[in-house]
């Protein structure tokens, strides 16, 4: 996060305007967001530094408690660790990439840069190569209407993917809007709703378990936080992906899903304060699509937590195994400098059909001092003992260190 421009920094952090106020004002003013003439818009307040010398994705750290934005540095490190430069994903033009929980476009921006380099010999023409990457390889499902604007701005340089240059307005999308025939491009604006059971006093969404009376259903909010990817019935997959992308099969699924839905007691993203964890639902949904690779950055507490939701989650994961590598950071600030996430965070590379040992890398800190990184291989899931649950890291696991 840049330290320049306190006013803008406070605005972006939501100290001057709340998350809801920023999101709602941007969404309601979409028709004027192009900034014609001298007109100033709400989105301009968030992005005006981008045209100068600053990186928008380094400026915006977080717009709310429910979604933790991935920093550019963390995204780059995650890609370096899970998919090294010589990995096949960077030189295969036929792969389809899906981010089912996009927030700011950081993953696909960094991925596009690497694909542009890796596909140089396969598609020598620079224009055709970039067009192929953007139109045939990268597909995004956004979390909110607000984040869909950010993602398109990041990937296409404009909130309308088919925006062309006009005499009245100098702004235009990538390739002068010629690569797409619609405003969204390959970035889906969410449109699903929560599904509440009609029976019982405390009605909860059957997909994410949020309460019908909670803030996500307030009439004053333009966002319902009914994340499309986990609010789809299995029989909707084909029509959803075919309608929005014209693609049915995804080879690489990657992202940083929302960690949980905040609660009325002030639960924050990842703090475990009684809120409903939902990141595991994104992982399970992704596995249902049977990609070749799955990579996500999520809270690490699922690994050995005794919470019922994570016991069930691990039981389902054991059926697929496939964990080729996992990096665990017991201090979440290694990945998110401005966030404290209970139990740390981890990112992993799941590979379809992989049955070998898992390369485990751990990093811990003590009293603010970074300790050495520890790397080793072992079976990710321990053998079943006396018909009890298979567990990961059967010896002591805490938020500081793993003892083997």
Curated annotation (Swiss-Prot):
Family per similarity comment: Belongs to the N(4)/N(6)-methyltransferase family.
Source species, domain of life: Bacteria
UniProt keyword terms in alphabetical order: Methyltransferase, S-adenosyl-L-methionine, Transferase
Catalytic activity: a 2'-deoxyadenosine in DNA + S-adenosyl-L-methionine = an N(6)-methyl-2'-deoxyadenosine in DNA + S-adenosyl-L-homocysteine + H(+)
EC assignment: 2.1.1.72
Gene Ontology molecular functions: nucleic acid binding; site-specific DNA-methyltransferase (adenine-specific) activity
One Pfam family from the record: Eco57I
Name this polypeptide is given: Uncharacterized adenine-specific methylase MPN_108
BP term (GO), one: methylation
Stored Gene3D superfamilies: Vaccinia Virus protein VP39
Chain ranges passing through the membrane: none
Top EC category: transferase
